[in-house]
Amino acid sequence: MILASATVDVITPNTPKRIGNFRVEVWGKAPYDFVRHYEIMAQSDTIAAQQGIARFVAEMEAMPEPPVQGS
C-alpha cells in the first residue's frame, strides 16, 4: 500500500459555472517518500486532492521496485 498526503492551493477558484484550477502537492511515506506537484482542473479542492493522490500512487506503482532506504 502506498500512503500519501496532499495540500491544495487555489490558482483559479471554481464557480457554479466553471471548474477551478488547483496546485496540488503530494508526498508519500517511506519507501515512497517523494514529493510531486500537479496542476489540476477540478470541481473542488477536495476532488483535486483526490486526483493528485491518485496520480502519485499511479506513478509510484509504475516504478520497477520500491526504493531502498539508506542507499
Regions inferred by a protein language model and the residue ranges of each:
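Short N-terminal "domain-start" leader segments
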Residues: M1-N21
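A short, exposed loop/beta-hairpin motif centered on an aromatic-Gly-Thr core
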Residues: D33-D45
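Short, mixed-charge low-complexity intrinsically disordered segments
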Residues: L3, A58-S71
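A structural detector for beta-sheet-dominated domains
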Residues: D9-I11, E25-W27, M41-Q43
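Short aromatic-glycine-(Arg/Gly/Cys) micro-motifs in beta-strand/loop hairpins
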Residues: P16-V35
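A short, charged, amphipathic alpha-helix used as a generic interaction element across diverse proteins
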Residues: Q43-P64
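Detector for intrinsically disordered, low-structure N-terminal pre-sequences
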Residues: T7-D9, R23, G52, F56, ...
